[in-house]
């Protein structure tokens, strides 16, 4: 059984899948005891993307840090392992954006709860995830989503810079596979990079 908690600040309700129970909740407000216990928590919620975090640093940091703290507090109370979505953005500089810092802070919180309280936490970093339901337009759109949207609308593909920027692009199915492989391992703050290990330039894409 899968239960999803989401406030839909960046997600879409039309992306709902069969076999999953959806609860509209803002995890910054914490969890209540009426919530049933779980075998594992995948903490994937965050205000993502670099540019929006630069425009709204306080909102991004408070949202991402406080929500992670609430998840860890609840998990520690119920002794539920947590698998946390860290960020590959810190590799571009920890202080390069409020988003990168907030996700790094979340990683450190996971390590803290493992070290001090013995909570099982696993940190997984994603690399440019794409798939059927990625966002195609707006502030939170990914580069693959933007290209796809422009292609479908018979528009020229927009390249910023010389197009030689190289990235590791990872399909969502591979991300899910990596996350599932971490279940039941009883890790204590270990970090895993989930990617293909092969990079492509924006021109290649």
PLM region descriptions:
Residues 18-19, 87, 139, 143, ...:
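Activation loop
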Residues 1-129, 173, 179, 203:
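N-terminal Rossmann-like NAD(P)+-binding domain of SDR-like oxidoreductases, especially those catalyzing
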Residues 34, 94, 136-139, 143, ...:
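Residues at alpha-helix caps and immediate loop-helix transition turns in enzyme cores, especially N-
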Residues 104, 129-145, 153-156, 160, ...:
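Glycine/proline-rich active-site loop of Rossmann-fold NAD(P)-dependent oxidoreductases
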Residues 123, 169, 199:
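Short aromatic/basic micro-patch
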Residues 55, 59, 96, 134-135, ...:
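Short capping/connector residues at structural and topological boundaries
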Residues 113, 147, 151:
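Short amphipathic helix/loop within the catalytic HATPase_c
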